[in-house]
Swiss-Prot record:
Ubiquitinated by AREL1. The lineage of its organism: Eukaryota, Metazoa, Chordata, Craniata, Vertebrata. Belongs to the TRAFAC class TrmE-Era-EngA-EngB-Septin-like GTPase superfamily. Septin GTPase family. Keywords: Cell cycle, Cell division, Cell projection, Cilium, Coiled coil, Cytoplasm, Cytoplasmic vesicle, Differentiation, Flagellum, GTP-binding, Nucleotide-binding, Phosphoprotein, Spermatogenesis, Synapse, Ubl conjugation. It is found in: Cytoplasm; Cell projection, Cilium, Flagellum; Cytoplasmic vesicle, Secretory vesicle; Cell projection, Axon. It comes from the Eukaryota. This is Septin-4. PROSITE patterns: G_SEPTIN. Residues 95-108 have a biased composition (Low complexity). The modification Phosphoserine is found at residues 117-118, 325, 432. Residues 141-414 form the Septin-type G domain. Transmembrane segments: none annotated.
Length: 478
């Protein structure tokens, strides 16, 4: 059979092609003839044999390779694997495929699902699931958050807390009369409640300070509040330094909402002293209470005045963290709006009223309705967004990394100084030969008392040295 007949679309016989190739292999061939031959030859489809075209167009079907007589029929553990083989007996080997997207566990992260990666499956390792593991463990453990509210009575602290978390923490509260409040001192009360939302549990602790600023003489009325914060730091420090550190209950105060009266022209001296006494211990968020008693221009002037006085007196309130460069633009705008809203002008209400065909929480007045969750009426929504949705974890981080670490460093320095003093006293006692040790300065002593004790210690040390010299002279004489 003539092979040239099997070359479909061929206009050049095989003998002519072979003769042309032999002729161009000679040195006498010029470039013009070579170019013409290459042009004719490149457009010819006869350069591919029909067997090659048929094999390329045939789909690759994986068939099991025929096995030799199996010597391991009785033992499945040592049976060799059966490798696939193509139809033309051309052997090849394939590595086991990685975990396919359909076989991977699903994630509750939605669009941020690290499993749904556009990369090739061969590049998938699995450490992208670490956020899911942390998320699952954190949700199972739950979260703790301690919020302190401070300010004068009657500024709506309890109402605002109930409005923020949609709870009633003060249902059993007893209001004192005027005579009972005359001799009232600042007390610290705690209200704990467990809140669950979409499977996430939050152990919320509200620390209230009834009696603050209600007396005629409010000198150092913030001391009980500062002592309470230090006590929680001390308790956590002891638990952290103990042997059993697995289940440590975190009662540290993560945020303090300080309520400022809307009446007046700015901060009062009590407000300044309170915030200056606590700004190194807790995150302070100033709140302009009862904003419905002010007109919008008055609210703006009041806010501007409070911010100026906070900067003038060197008060360090909670600072919002800077947004990363890869943050969403909407989040950046929201964060900027929160920064500009300090102090938050809020209105609290647990009463549901009807406004324009809707049932909303607000306050009903003869001239209209003030809606608590209306951004045009107050900053309640912004405060809730900052406190619960966007910056709750940052408040806890600042408490742990800044305020608690400062307290912990002070405790370690105090303990180190006491140890050094005790060693020096023991060394002096051994050298002097006396049996009565010099007492140490008790912790928590005020500076004047500590200075007096130190002077007495120096005087006693000089007396011991004189006594030691006299004893030495008497031994040498006799």
């Amino acid at each position: 059979m003539d092979r040239s007949l099997g070359w479909q679309g061929s206009s050049v016989p095989e003998d002519r092609t072979e003769a042309g190739i032999k002729r161009f292999l000679e040195d006498t061939t010029d470039d013009g003839e070579l170019s013409k031959f290459v042009k004719d030859f490149s457009g010819n489809e006869s350069c591919h044999p029909p067997e090659a075209k048929t094999w390329a167009s045939r789909p690759q079907v994986l068939e099991p390779r025929p096995q030799a007589p199996d010597l391991y029929d009785d033992d499945l553990e040592f049976r060799p694997p059966s490798w696939p083989q193509s139809a033309d007996n051309q052997q090849y080997f394939c590595a086991p495929a990685p975990l396919s997207p359909s076989a991977r566990p699903r994630s509750p992260w939605g669009k941020l699902d690290p499993y749904d990666s556009s990369e090739d499956d061969k590049e998938y390792v699995g450490f992208a699931t670490l956020p899911n593991q942390v998320h699952r463990k954190s949700v199972k453990k739950g979260f703790d958050f301690t919020l302190m509210v401070a300010g004068e009575s009657g500024l709506g602290k309890s109402t605002l807390v109930n409005s923020l978390f949609l709870t009633d923490l003060y249902r059993d509260r007893k209001l004192l009369g005027a005579e009972e409040r005359i001799m009232q001192t600042v007390e610290i009360t705690k209200h704990a409640v467990d809140i669950e939302e979409k499977g996430v549990r939050l152990r919320l602790t509200i620390v209230d300070t009834p009696g603050f600023g209600d007396a005629v003489n409010n000198t150092e009325c913030w001391k009980p509040v500062a002592e309470y914060i230090d006590q929680q730091f001390e308790q956590y420090f002891r638990d952290e330094s103990g042997l059993n550190r697995k289940n440590i209950q975190d009662n540290r105060v993560h945020c303090c909402l300080y309520f400022i009266s809307p009446f007046g022209h700015g901060l009062r001296p009590l407000d300044v002293e309170f915030m200056k006494a606590l700004h190194q211990r807790v995150n302070i968020v100033p709140i302009l209470a009862k904003a419905d008693t002010l007109t919008p221009p008055e609210v703006d002037r009041k806010k501007r005045k409070i911010r100026e006085e906070i900067e003038h007196f060197g008060i360090k309130i909670y600072q919002f963290p800077d947004c990363d460069s890869d943050e969403d633009e909407d989040f950046k705008l929201q964060d900027q709006a929160l920064k500009e809203s300090i102090p938050f002008a809020v209105i609290g209400s647990n009463t549901v009223v009807e406004a324009r065909g809707r049932r909303v929480r607000g306050r009903l007045y003869p001239w209209g309705i003030v809606e608590v969750e209306n951004p045009g009426h107050c900053d309640f929504v912004k405060l809730r967004t900052m406190l619960v949705r966007t910056h709750m974890q940052d408040l806890k981080d600042v408490t742990r990394e800044t305020h608690y670490e400062n307290y912990r460093a002070q405790c370690i320095q105090s303990m180190t100084r006491l140890v050094v003093k005790e060693r020096n006293r023991n060394k002096l006692t051994r050298e002097s030969g006396t049996d009565f040790p010099i007492p140490a300065v008790p912790p928590g002593t005020d500076p004047e008392t500590e200075k007096l004790i130190r002077e007495k210690d120096e005087e006693l040390r000089r007396m011991q040295e004189i006594l030691h010299k006299i004893q030495k002279q008497m031994k040498e004489t006799y």
